Amino acid sequence: MRRILVIFCGCLTLHNGAAIAQESGATMVIEPKAVIESAVNAGDLAFAVAAVGNAGGEIWSYASGHKDADKKRAASSNDIIQIASMTKLVTTIAALQLVERGALELDTPIDAYVPELAGLQVLNGFDANDGPLFEQASRAPTTRELITHTAGYVYESWNSNARRAANLGVTESAFGSGNFLASPLAFQPGTNWEYGISTDWLGALVERRSATRLANYFAKNIFQPLGMDDSHYELPEGKLHRTVTVMARAGDSLVPAPMLQPQAMEAGSMAFYSGGGGLYSTLSDYGRVLQMLLNGGSLNGMTILKPETVDAMFSNHVGDIQPAALTTAMPSISNTADMSFGAPATFGLGLLIHPQGILNGRRSNTGSWAGLFNSYYWVDRESGIYGIFGTQILPFYDAATIATLAQFERAVYSSKVGSKLTRSAK
């Protein structure tokens, strides 16, 4: 892999492709274009797309590279990507809407809503003969614990016991077509933090309590009110040409990843909608979710969440429990990932929270997360901006992508020194 070389000066000038935004009579110049082009031109990334916005909407976007492995279709900022676990924020918003309506309670054990979850077991490991060692769960997780990843559910890609259980046939793999939601817990609810399938169960709760399939709930209560016309579980045939090939690292090369490519599907045809992943979207569409959060839960005269609910999303809901690095158990799927980027972190309602910000520029209590195919976002309410950076590469936490993301963030924040983005919506 060639090293990404980007020289980004603190003194910014206008170049072709720079984005300019007017704020209270001042001119603000954003030029992260060089960061993105450098990574693509060096061959570190085949495709990259990025966007920056504030409470008034998207103010800058740019794409570089190609949508396809044959390099016949140039990248565009309105390309549709698979956002994977960025779906989790949408599912969390849906669940919080039901909390506001009284259909869910954050601290009620979920077997009150899903009786079949009574009597859960915890997988503690294996004996010398590969026999699973179970103990009874003290109780079912709560809705809050599902949202904060303290429920005990994990992913086999970052948990060696869960990976071993899937390999031995003790549980269904989350990467297959089986009933992976029936997996045991990895720890007693509320005692630890580990990223996992909790948000899939949260999506199931949304369906159960709203009596609506998740795709339909999202469309009616989130996508349509926010004007998100390019966000789908089932991609329409007419939009397939706007999608991006998922690539995988193969030594110093990038090759198409098997079985993970975009495909068109008829609306309503999926048997299972994953609350933890599966959406297609554009950065412009997803940015409207982040813009809504910067506006305290409302956009275009539509209230998606109450302001106090949005405030709660950016607050610590795990106490002294520390979100840990995601230690890989499946290197082809993910590298070991430090989503806190070396800074102190906690977890809110659906967001990793940086109480002290991070060195790349995010301010105190910025919320963030990511998607498996190396798409990343952050919402910085103190600065009044959001940012999204996306590729379509495996494994997750790709070194070249993370390096480019860090430089992109520094470019965004350097470009606004001495200026503050307006928080008022248009």
Provide a role label for each language-model segment:
Residues 1-4:
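Positively charged n-region of N-terminal signal peptides that target proteins for export
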Residues 6-15:
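Bacterial N-terminal signal peptides
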Residues 19-23:
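Boundary at the C-terminal end of the N-terminal hydrophobic targeting segment
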Residues 25-83, 103-105, 122-126, 398:
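Short, conserved catalytic-motif segment at the N-terminal edge
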Residues 30-36, 56, 82-110, 118, ...:
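Active-site SXXK
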Residues 115, 120-361:
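Short, surface-exposed loop or secondary-structure junction motifs
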Residues 366, 373-386:
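Short, surface-exposed beta-strand/loop micro-motifs that present aromatic residues
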